[in-house]
Structure formats: C-alpha cells, structure tokens
C-alpha cells in the first residue's frame, strides 16, 4: 500500500505531468492514424480527403488535422466508405 495522496498526484512535478499528458495525447493520435479502414470525408468548405477510419469520429479528427482546422468546424460533414483502390493521406507532421 502506498502513501496517502500518492494517487492524487501529490509529489508529481508539473513538467512530469505535462510530459505524461503529451505522451498520452500523442499515443492516441498515432493509434487513430494506424486504423485499418479508410473513409472519405467530404466538406463543402475544405473539399474531400481520404483518411484512416476507426470510427466516424476518428475520421473527422484525422480530416481536421489534415485540413488544419478544429474538428468542431467539420462535425456535420459527411463520412463515406472509401473505395478499395483509394489510399489514405499520410499522417501530417506537427511542429
């Protein structure tokens, strides 16, 4: 049994907490981009893009990342199954 408050984050530096949070976010992003399915996201404003598809929400997140917009701007856009010959765009590199 550990010390009291150990699970509450006491004794953890802000830098360590930020690093942990970043690693979780980056891991989720990589898993989203490694999905086996493909979807075509169609937007009136941004056009069409083929992205990896684990779910419709994941496809919207990937499309928003490609287009450089917030996913809430495109949450009402259409997500369609991509044809077998279509390939998804590569994962963008974030700076």
Where are these regions (language model features)?
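Short linear proline/tyrosine/threonine-rich motifs used for host-factor recruitment
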Residues: 40-43, 50-52, 81, 88
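Residue-level detector of alpha-helical secondary structure
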Residues: 21, 34, 61-64
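Short, mixed-charge low-complexity intrinsically disordered segments
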Residues: 66-95
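A short, exposed loop/beta-hairpin motif centered on an aromatic-Gly-Thr core
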Residues: 11, 45-56
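Contiguous bioactive effector segments
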Residues: 2-16
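A short, charged, amphipathic alpha-helix used as a generic interaction element across diverse proteins
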Residues: 54-72
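Short aromatic-glycine-(Arg/Gly/Cys) micro-motifs in beta-strand/loop hairpins
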Residues: 29-47
